[in-house]
């Protein structure tokens, strides 16, 4: 897909989910905010991407660019504090981080017992963190950003997109709900799991509902791996990763096919075709940083 310079320096952001790897996106956003040359119209995020989106929106609303940088730092610092230092150890290669054996054993129970049994009281430290950091009532009333948060209906597999007027702590928790660890988050009588199963992230709302033609994709999942997995655990992790990127890749292929069709058109372009021709994608990916990291680092 083609790219160009946007004379108005306004962009949309599409923020991929990826657990703790979302700290990479925090770094990207911090750099963009510090640079100061870009404005933002819409932000679409899934899971950790959704958390980055609302933290950034909260900060922009209360303190401009500096406020957004402060809000993101505050959020990720508080999130890191929820993980005990004893939970991780240095991996054998000396570069990666691995879970301590005791915590690995705890996670293995998730292969045998549902969240209803492992976590009957549905304890989730993320809930306290999100509600403490984000003023959703004020965000819904005052935010200038168009926000889109993806979750997956646990009964149908369909995408549920929460827009700014619908945003709440439950919507963010739904977008980040791993079904093997936490119970489905119920909203309006429907259960929701992690948005990555349906859109990671959703790009189409930035095309249909925003005027800005430039979309910056911040990707956490490697577009290609160096090695083929061989152990059972590594294969499971690769399959799960593919499940979380398949919908995004399909969506991007659709845009690419439409752009190719429009570029070859022999007829006058309508409004939709002109919008396709005038949409530009830009990518910042974590390939060089994330491709060697194990799933445990998430």
Please report, for each region that a protein language model flagged, where it lies by residue.
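Helix-rich "cap/lid" substructures immediately adjacent to catalytic or cofactor-binding pockets
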Residues: 1-43, 130
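A short acidic-Thr-Gly-centered motif at the start of a beta-strand
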Residues: 3-5, 138-142, 178-189
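Short, hydrophobic alpha-helix immediately C-terminal to the catalytic nucleophile
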Residues: 26, 53-54, 203-204
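Catalytic nucleophile loop
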Residues: 40-58
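Active-site glycine-rich loop that binds ribose-phosphate moieties when present
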Residues: 127-137, 169, 173-184, 195-201
